[in-house]
Structure formats: C-alpha cells, structure tokens
C-alpha cells in the first residue's frame, strides 16, 4: 500500500482549514486516513506559530516507513526542522526542474 502525507481540507466555504494526514495514496482527498499528524490554517498570519502545527515524531516515523509527502507538506516538514529522506528531496528537485513557467496574464497580454 502506497502511503502519502498530504493535506485534507476542512472548514467552511471560503474559510479553509487543513489537516495534515497520512493516507493511502488512492483514498479520496477528504476521505479515510491512517493518522492525523498536524494542521494547517492558511487564514492565520504567516508569522503565527499555530499556522502550521506538526507532530514531528510521528512524521519522522511515517517518513521512515516510506510515506511520501506532497510538495506543500514537504515544505512544511522542512520548515519544522525535520530532515526529508534523500530520495524524496531528489524527486522534489526533478519535479521543480520539469515544471513549466507560464507567463502571467499581464505579461501574456503585453507580448
């Protein structure tokens, strides 16, 4: 079973709140999950300590068992001070390198 560490959306319309969960890769975004390992509240100020709350010990455990974080969650994990496995870092670099940079609407209009 492939396992991912990803965000599951909650909250009301226009008021998002996310749980950082460990879930089966084929499960729906907001469906069943194995464990809740943190929260992310984008409505709080970026300097607020409760904007991203992670259980570091449980994340380290799941990374050790082979769970792969999504790009956004990987950024949160690195900011929290947890080291990602080399394999995950390489995959993120490859994705970033292959990502196409599209011009903004304003730039496209001027060209």
From Swiss-Prot:
GO terms for molecular function: structural constituent of ribosome. Coiled coil: none annotated. Keywords: Ribonucleoprotein, Ribosomal protein. SUPFAM superfamilies: Ribosomal protein S16. GO terms for cellular component: cytoplasm; small ribosomal subunit. One of its GO terms (biological process) is translation. Belongs to the bacterial ribosomal protein bS16 family. This is Small ribosomal subunit protein bS16. It comes from Rickettsia felis (strain ATCC VR-1525 / URRWXCal2) (Rickettsia azadi). The gene is rpsP.
């Amino acid at each position: 079973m492939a396992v991912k560490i990803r965000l599951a959306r909650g909250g009301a319309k226009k008021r998002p709140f996310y749980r950082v969960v460990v879930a089966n890769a084929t499960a729906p975004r907001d469906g069943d999950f194995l464990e809740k390992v943190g929260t992310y509240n984008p409505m709080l100020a970026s300097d607020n300590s409760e904007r991203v709350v992670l259980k570091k010990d449980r994340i380290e455990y799941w990374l050790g068992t082979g769970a792969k974080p999504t790009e956004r969650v990987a950024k949160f994990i690195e900011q929290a001070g947890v080291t990602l496995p080399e394999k995950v870092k390489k995959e993120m670099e490859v994705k970033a390198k292959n990502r196409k940079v599209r011009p903004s609407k304003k730039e496209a209009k001027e060209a």
